[in-house]
């Protein structure tokens, strides 16, 4: 029986092969004879009908998106062949094969680290406001150097942002101006910023001069012309984009379910002719007037009526019915189709509004795609599959929509809300390429707080930062180092600093105590310090300035730091409770003395208050616990100008630390217990600690608030009404049931 089956299968296979060979041979002979007939007719001047002539011609089953014959008649020069397009693109960059290994000199960076030099501005050269903001962001960063011999990267002062020849911002004769720069060196180790390139009708990515071996930080760059790990794709931003700070995202709270009034929206220009018109002319097929609103208008450009079609009047009327901002804030998804160029202002607008972008721009290298995983924040569509977009986004689960929306807010606030953040992200990406052994990984770039606040020079291990304990499955540190800032001489054994030292040393969580001696008097003898169960290390400050208390000392062996002023009054129980609270919030400042900020309408400036109200926004570092990483961030991230101000005033260092931590975490600090008085009131009036009684001290702190807010570009401090007390605090139960029973008596 089995043999019969095998024979039958073999016979069937043989028959199929024979039929295939027969029909294939017939077609092959037919094609050869047809080619011979064509050759013969060509020699005799005769015309033979092609085989296609015998096939029936069916009418178009689908209506085209646009009357192509009309479009061709209006401007046939717009349509160029693929070969012409390839030739145009290939001539854009002569250094198209450039990579970091072949077109970048790493030796310049190994000498002095990653330093950026900006060419001095030339007389008579006009610079647009957007490019001035870019240069100001570089010059205000920690990477800037005014000495070209120390530079690793060079940035032109010549405005290269707008290279559209029809633009009033276009800089003429840029080729000769760049070549005349004595440090140009064929563009090696140079970075060129560009937002607009090419012009009507094809809008190629030609910047109008030979960039040589320079890197491009470019908007609307195509994947075809993008040089991986060499160029940087940046977003297209308007001239009104804030230089620093920027507005926060518009998502104030999460709605469950995360669906809004409209499923998908878009409102913009409809290009009747030319590049970018194909997709926008087809949007009306998807628009349903209910939860999918894709509105376009023909009213743009000087001669729009010349190209007006039969649908323009209806589109223009529908376009005027809806307010764009209202649509943006009430939509779940926002369509981001390409314009004349690949990039669009709609991209950043959607991110800020927490409207999940639906990208419809084939071939666009998305901004910072080298480090950002856009699949976590956007839907990547295909222009050729426009009609499938509604069904695709409707199939996305609500949990996924919520995650996408939250990620848009993180990315907006971390990398896109200001020109400064866009520039610094560009520089950090280049720095990671140069120093690959300490570069940031994808988790750092795509998780809070982002790559700008996580400095890999501090550590290459994520567990050394306070933000990734949950991701790594780690527990917060179990010990702390107490750092006591001493500014008065040790003259009595009853001084508050000695009582404080003993109280901190008795804590079960204390690993060691460091006394930072910032006093003008010599160090006291070792026998003057009380005996403790933990090591006591006395460090004499070299410069003896206020900022020295936040230096990243190697002697600090724990991740947790208990920062104390010498006149602070705390018990061991209070220290223990504050530390256990901090273990639940390791990225925040946790402590006792709370202060607040407010906006003074009469003076139009920020104010500082120590009054006890129902909320607070700062916890002073005279009695607070925080992560050691903030010492490194304070010393290496903040500009020298702010730290010099603190040192000159001998004031405001605690406010500056609160500004920094709130800017990183986007969260307020945490106050513990209801304790109000944390200072020793009997300190001598000749002591430097008596600065709190100085009438100028409070006025200085008011001034500091506004200076710090100006540098950050916004007010990072956040008000909170939360206070954490021990369980059963002041409850009418037995005192034996309470762990921190002593706190109620303090």
UniProtKB/Swiss-Prot annotation:
Binding-site residues, UDP: 267, 269, 271, 280, 319, 324, 346, 349
Disulfide cysteine pairs (residue numbers): 98-103, 109-152, 298-312, 334-355, 652-704
Description of post-translational modifications: N-glycosylated.
Amino-acid positions noted as binding a protein in the UniProt annotation, renumbered to this chain: 166, 203, 300
Pfam families: Exostosin_GT47, Glyco_transf_64
Subcellular location: Golgi apparatus membrane; Golgi apparatus, cis-Golgi network membrane; Endoplasmic reticulum membrane
Regions that span the bilayer: 8-28
Record membrane topology: Single-pass type II membrane protein
Catalyzed chemical reaction(s): 3-O-{alpha-D-GlcNAc-[(1->4)-beta-D-GlcA-(1->4)-alpha-D-GlcNAc](n)-(1->4)-beta-D-GlcA-(1->3)-beta-D-Gal-(1->3)-beta-D-Gal-(1->4)-beta-D-Xyl}-L-seryl-[protein] + UDP-alpha-D-glucuronate = 3-O-{[(1->4)-beta-D-GlcA-(1->4)-alpha-D-GlcNAc](n+1)-(1->4)-beta-D-GlcA-(1->3)-beta-D-Gal-(1->3)-beta-D-Gal-(1->4)-beta-D-Xyl}-L-seryl-[protein] + UDP + H(+)
Keywords of the record: Disulfide bond, Endoplasmic reticulum, Glycoprotein, Glycosyltransferase, Golgi apparatus, Manganese, Membrane, Metal-binding, Signal-anchor, Transferase, Transmembrane, Transmembrane helix
Lumenal side stretches: 29-746
Residue ranges annotated as Cytoplasmic topological domain: 1-7
EC code(s) of this entry: 2.4.1.225
Top-level enzyme category: transferase
Keyword ATP-binding: no
GO biological-process terms attached to the record: antigen processing and presentation; axon guidance; basement membrane organization; blood vessel remodeling; BMP signaling pathway; bone growth; bone morphogenesis; bone resorption
Listed pathway(s): Protein modification; protein glycosylation
GO molecular function: glucuronosyl-N-acetylglucosaminyl-proteoglycan 4-alpha-N-acetylglucosaminyltransferase activity; glycosyltransferase activity; metal ion binding; N-acetylglucosaminyl-proteoglycan 4-beta-glucuronosyltransferase activity; protein heterodimerization activity; protein homodimerization activity
Residues annotated as glycosylated: 89, 330
Cellular component annotations (GO), alphabetically ordered: catalytic complex; endoplasmic reticulum membrane; Golgi apparatus; Golgi membrane; synapse
Homology family: Belongs to the glycosyltransferase 47 family.
Function in brief: Glycosyltransferase forming with EXT2 the heterodimeric heparan sulfate polymerase which catalyzes the elongation of the heparan sulfate glycan backbone. Glycan backbone extension consists in the alternating transfer of (1->4)-beta-D-GlcA and (1->4)-alpha-D-GlcNAc residues from their respective UDP-sugar donors.
Subunit structure: Part of the heparan sulfate polymerase, a dimeric complex composed of EXT1 and EXT2. Could also form homooligomeric complexes. Interacts with NDST1.
Identification of the protein by name: Exostosin-1
């Amino acid at each position: 029986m089995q043999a019969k089956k095998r024979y039958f299968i073999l016979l069937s296979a043989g028959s199929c092969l024979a039929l295939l060979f027969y029909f294939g041979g017939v077609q092959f002979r037919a094609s050869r004879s047809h080619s011979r007939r064509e050759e013969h007719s060509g020699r005799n001047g005769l015309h033979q009908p092609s085989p296609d002539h015998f096939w029936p011609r069916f009418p178009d089953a689908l209506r085209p998106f646009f009357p192509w014959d009309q479009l061709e008649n209006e401007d046939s020069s717009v349509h160029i062949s693929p070969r012409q397009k390839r030739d145009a693109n290939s001539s854009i960059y002569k250094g198209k094969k450039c990579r970091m290994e072949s077109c970048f000199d790493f030796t310049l960076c190994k000498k002095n680290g990653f330093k950026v030099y900006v060419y001095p501005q030339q007389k008579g050269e006009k610079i647009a406001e957007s490019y001035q903001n870019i240069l100001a962001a570089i010059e205000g960063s920690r990477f800037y150097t005014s000495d070209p011999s120390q530079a690793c990267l060079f940035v032109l002062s010549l405005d290269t942002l707008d290279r559209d020849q029809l633009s009033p911002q276009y800089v003429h004769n840029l080729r000769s101006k760049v070549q005349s720069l004595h440090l140009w060196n064929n563009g090696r180790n140079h970075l060129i910023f560009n937002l607009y390139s090419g012009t009507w009708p094809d809008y190629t990515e030609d910047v109008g001069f030979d960039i040589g071996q320079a890197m491009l930080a470019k908007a609307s760059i195509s994947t075809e012309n993008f040089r991986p790990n060499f160029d940087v794709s940046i977003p297209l931003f308007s001239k009104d984009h804030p230089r620093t700070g920027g507005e926060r995202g518009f998502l104030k709270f999460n709605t469950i379910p995360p669906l809004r009034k409209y499923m998908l929206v878009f409102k913009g220009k409809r290009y009747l002719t030319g590049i970018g018109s194909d997709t926008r002319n087809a949007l009306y097929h998807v628009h349903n007037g209910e939860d999918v609103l894709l509105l376009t208008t023909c009213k743009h450009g000087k001669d729009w009526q010349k190209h007006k079609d039969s649908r323009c009047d209806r589109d223009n009327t529908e376009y005027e019915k809806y307010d764009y901002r209202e649509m943006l804030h009430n939509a779940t998804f926002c369509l981001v189709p390409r314009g004349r160029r690949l990039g669009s202002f709609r991209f950043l607008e959607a991110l800020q509004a927490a409207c999940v972008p639906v990208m419809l721009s084939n071939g666009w290298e998305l901004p910072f795609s080298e480090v950002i995983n856009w699949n976590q924040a956007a839907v990547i569509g295909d222009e050729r599959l426009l009609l499938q977009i509604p069904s695709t986004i409707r199939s996305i689960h609500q949990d996924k929509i919520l995650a996408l929306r939250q990620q848009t807010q993180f990315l907006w606030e971390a990398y896109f809300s200001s020109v400064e953040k866009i520039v610094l992200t560009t520089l950090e990406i280049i720095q990671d390429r140069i120093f690959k052994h300490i570069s940031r990984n994808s988790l750092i770039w795509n998780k809070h707080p982002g790559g700008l606040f996580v400095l890999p020079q501090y550590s290459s291990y994520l567990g050394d930062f306070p933000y990734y304990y949950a991701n790594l499955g780690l527990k917060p540190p179990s010990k702390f180092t107490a750092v006591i800032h001493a500014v008065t001489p040790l003259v009595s054994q009853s001084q508050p600093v000695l009582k404080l030292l003993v109280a901190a040393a008795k804590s079960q969580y204390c690993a060691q105590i460091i006394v930072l001696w910032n006093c003008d008097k010599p160090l006291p003898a070792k026998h003057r310090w009380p005996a403790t169960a933990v090591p006591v290390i006395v460090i004499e400050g070299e410069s003896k300035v206020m900022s020295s208390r936040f230096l990243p000392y190697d002697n600090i062996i724990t991740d947790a730091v208990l920062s104390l002023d010498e006149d602070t009054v705390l018990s061991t129980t209070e220290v223990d409770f504050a530390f256990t609270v901090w273990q639940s919030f390791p990225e925040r400042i946790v402590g006792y003395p709370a202060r607040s900020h407010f906006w003074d309408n009469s003076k139009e400036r920020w104010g500082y208050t120590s009054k006890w109200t129902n909320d607070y926004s700062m916890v002073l570092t005279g009695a607070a616990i925080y992560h050691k990483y903030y010492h490194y961030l304070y010393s290496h991230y903040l500009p020298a100008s702010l730290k010099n101000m603190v040192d000159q005033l001998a004031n405001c260092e605690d406010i500056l630390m609160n500004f920094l931590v709130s800017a990183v975490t986007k969260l307020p600090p945490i106050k513990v217990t209801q304790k109000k008085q944390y200072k020793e009131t009997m300190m001598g009036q000749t002591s430097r600690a008596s600065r709190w009684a100085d009438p100028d001290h409070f006025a200085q702190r008011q001034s500091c608030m506004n200076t710090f807010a100006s540098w950050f570009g916004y007010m990072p401090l956040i008000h909170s009404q939360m206070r954490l007390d021990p369980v059963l605090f002041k409850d009418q139960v037995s005192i034996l049931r309470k762990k921190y029973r002593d706190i109620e008596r303090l």
